[in-house]
Structures are given as structure tokens and as C-alpha cells.
């Protein structure tokens, strides 16, 4: 059994936290829409922006998970390692661009967000607001990446 302290109380994300989260998530649909439906000359920049933002957000979420784990009296090294690996995986996927087709890169980011979401929802004793925010981030990222993947596959 995991040896962690219990969550302090049930919390829902505040309005300010939702506002910040929505602003931080806005590059996902905006860049995916420009890549999929915008002028052709903007497609490369929009896709690059989407992939870089995916890398930044995956790295950030890994850092959040690391922070949640290090607050524990006895942090578990496996959870800390997974947190670091999420950030490393995001950078490896991004740096593989040019060596692998864009469809694989986009699919890699989709998979990374889904794995991270699954991990977040199986982590015991996190603040109750964290799974809700994690779902919003993963949902926004995955829908946007799926839209970009569809465009990349049909190009």
C-alpha cells in the first residue's frame, strides 16, 4: 500500500485557477485550428507551435507531479522518476521531429498526454482539484492533437 499522507480536504478549483488554466490551454485549440483550417503558409508554424506547447505543458505537469510527491515525508522514487521521464519523453518526441514523420510525432504527444492522464488518476491522495485540472489539460491537448493528426494524415 502506498505510504502517503491523506489529502487535507476536498477542494474544487477556484475561479482564478480555472481562468489561468483556460488561458494556459488556449494555445492547444488555437494552433490546431490554424494548422487544420488556416492559410497554408501558416501550417508549418502552427504545427511547430502546437508541438512546442505540448512539450512545455508535459514538462510542467511532470514538475507538478514531482512537487506533489516531494511534499510527502518519504517521497517514492518511482513516482519521482516517472515525473522526470514525462518531461524527458516530451523533449525526445519533439527532438525526433525531422527524423520521424509528423504523424508519428503528433501521435507520440497524444500517447504521452494519455499516459500522463492515466497516471494522474491513479495517484493516491492528491488534492481533489488536481484530477479535474489534469482532465481539462489532457482533454484539451488530446482533442487538439487529434485534430492536427487528422490534418497531417490527410496532407
Q: What annotation goes with each model-predicted range?
A:
Residues 8-23:
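N-terminal membrane topogenic signal
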Residues 43-57, 101-111:
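Structural signature of hydrophobic alpha-helical transmembrane segments
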Residues 24-29, 81-91, 133-150:
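Small-residue-rich segments of transmembrane alpha-helices in multi-pass membrane proteins
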Residues 97-108, 117-132:
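Membrane-helix boundary connector in multi-pass membrane proteins
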Amino acid at each position: 500500500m502506498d505510504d502517503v499522507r491523506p489529502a487535507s480536504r476536498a477542494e474544487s478549483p477556484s475561479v482564478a485557477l480555472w481562468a489561468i488554466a483556460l488561458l494556459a490551454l488556449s494555445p492547444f485549440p488555437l494552433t490546431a485550428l490554424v494548422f487544420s483550417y488556416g492559410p497554408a503558409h501558416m501550417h508549418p508554424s502552427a504545427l511547430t507551435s502546437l508541438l512546442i506547447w505540448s512539450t512545455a505543458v508535459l514538462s510542467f505537469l511532470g514538475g507538478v507531479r514531482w512537487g506533489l510527491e516531494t511534499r510527502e515525508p518519504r517521497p517514492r522514487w518511482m513516482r519521482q522518476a516517472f515525473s522526470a521521464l514525462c518531461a524527458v519523453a516530451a523533449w525526445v518526441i519533439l527532438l525526433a521531429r525531422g527524423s520521424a514523420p509528423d504523424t508519428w510525432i503528433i501521435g507520440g504527444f497524444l500517447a504521452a498526454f494519455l499516459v500522463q492522464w492515466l497516471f494522474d488518476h491513479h495517484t493516491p491522495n492528491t488534492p481533489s482539484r488536481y484530477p479535474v485540472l489534469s482532465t481539462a489539460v489532457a482533454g484539451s491537448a488530446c482533442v487538439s492533437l487529434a485534430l492536427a493528426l487528422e490534418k497531417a494524415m490527410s496532407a
